[in-house]
């Protein structure tokens, strides 16, 4: 596939871009800084500038695309990850502006250029727990895509707005637009660096409801979306299968979630339900912090 990927130089994006490139996809990375990954083209741009987005969608991805003499090819898909990645990096209103306006511009350009598959990064923060003022408990466990989204911060608000924006574009266009509520992304080097501390101090993972997503498995999730057509608008949680701490489901519930309704769950099953992605997309996360630390 010929894929336009925004934000491919970021923490989550660079692993997804590498995964897609290794799987044979042609990827144009659009970001404020170049990725420099072999076989991936880079284009520097600002997603909040609609003119720059329209220009990129109508431009060649590399010199080789000049050779056929048939004009600029249409992208097969857009993967939109570019954003202010969390709160407290800039002012609240700037975080909200960049994330909402940028997403509008990318999806608008994609639809107007006839790109029929759009995948965008939403967030675990939409559920209102991660960046809450004080402790917020889920209404039930595990959290699935039907759980209420009531965020308190500008970052999570922007992600909820982006889901509404995407739904509106999908209804008008009929294209496939899938949103990924991505949990805390873990890069391979972070297992040895951080997870012993999480085992010793599980409180550190409470705001992420003890869940995580391996950056390489996130790449697989993106490709699962690329390979699945005809779903219209859908939202998917993205997480690995197990808790990010060395406590059982029962122990975590007793310590942190007293009074929260809990469905029947396995002893290490994530509180951030990924069953929808498995059923509808064939998502099959391969990594676990336990095997990463042991081998």
Tell where the protein language model's regions lie, with residue ranges:
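Conserved Rossmann-fold NAD(P)-dependent oxidoreductase catalytic core, especially the SDR/UDP-sugar
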Residues: 105-152
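Glycine/proline-rich active-site loop of Rossmann-fold NAD(P)-dependent oxidoreductases
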Residues: 172-176, 185-200, 224-235
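Catalytic helix-loop patch of NAD(P)-dependent Rossmann-fold dehydrogenases
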Residues: 97, 133-174
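Conserved beta-loop-beta element that borders a ligand/cofactor-binding pocket
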Residues: 122, 163-188
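N-terminal Rossmann NAD(P)H-binding glycine-rich loop of SDR-like oxidoreductase domains
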Residues: 3-23
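C-terminal substrate-binding subdomain of Rossmann-fold SDR/epimerase-dehydratase oxidoreductases
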Residues: 216-295
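NAD(P)H-binding glycine-rich loop region in Rossmannoid oxidoreductase-like domains
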Residues: 36, 47-98
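A conserved pocket-lining segment of Rossmann-fold NAD(P)-dependent short-chain dehydrogenase/reductase
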Residues: 145-152, 179-213
């Amino acid at each position: 596939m010929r894929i336009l990927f925004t934000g491919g130089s970021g923490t989550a994006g660079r692993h997804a871009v590498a995964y897609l490139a290794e799987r044979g996809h042609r990827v144009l990375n659009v970001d404020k800084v170049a990725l420099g990954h072999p076989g991936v083209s880079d284009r520097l741009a600002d997603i909040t500038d609609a003119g720059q987005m329209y220009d990129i969608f109508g431009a060649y991805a590399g010199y080789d695309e000049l050779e056929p003499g048939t004009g600029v090819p249409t992208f097969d898909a857009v993967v939109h990850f570019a954003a202010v990645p969390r709160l407290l990096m800039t002012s609240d209103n700037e975080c909200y502006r960049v994330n909402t306006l940028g997403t509008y511009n990318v999806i608008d350009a994609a639809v107007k250029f006839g790109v029929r598959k759009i995948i965008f990064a939403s967030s675990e923060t939409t559920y209102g727990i991660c960046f809450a003022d004080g402790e917020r408990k889920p209404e039930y466990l595990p959290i699935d895509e039907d759980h209420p989204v009531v965020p308190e911060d500008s970052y999570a608000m922007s992600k909820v707005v982006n889901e509404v924006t995407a739904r509106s574009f999908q209804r008008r266009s009929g294209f496939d637009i899938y949103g990924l509520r991505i949990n805390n992304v873990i890069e391979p080097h972070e297992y040895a660096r951080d997870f012993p501390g999480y085992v010793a101090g599980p409180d550190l993972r409470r705001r992420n409801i003890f869940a995580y997503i391996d950056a390489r498995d996130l790449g697989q999730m993106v490709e699962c979306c690329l390979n699945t057509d005809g779903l219209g608008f859908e939202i998917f949680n993205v997480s690995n299968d197990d808790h990010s701490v060395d406590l059982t489901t029962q122990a975590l519930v007793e310590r942190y979630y007293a009074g929260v309704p809990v469905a029947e769950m396995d002893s290490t099953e994530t509180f951030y339900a990924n069953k929808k992605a498995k059923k509808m997309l064939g998502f099959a996360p391969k990594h676990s912090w336990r095997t990463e630390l042991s081998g």
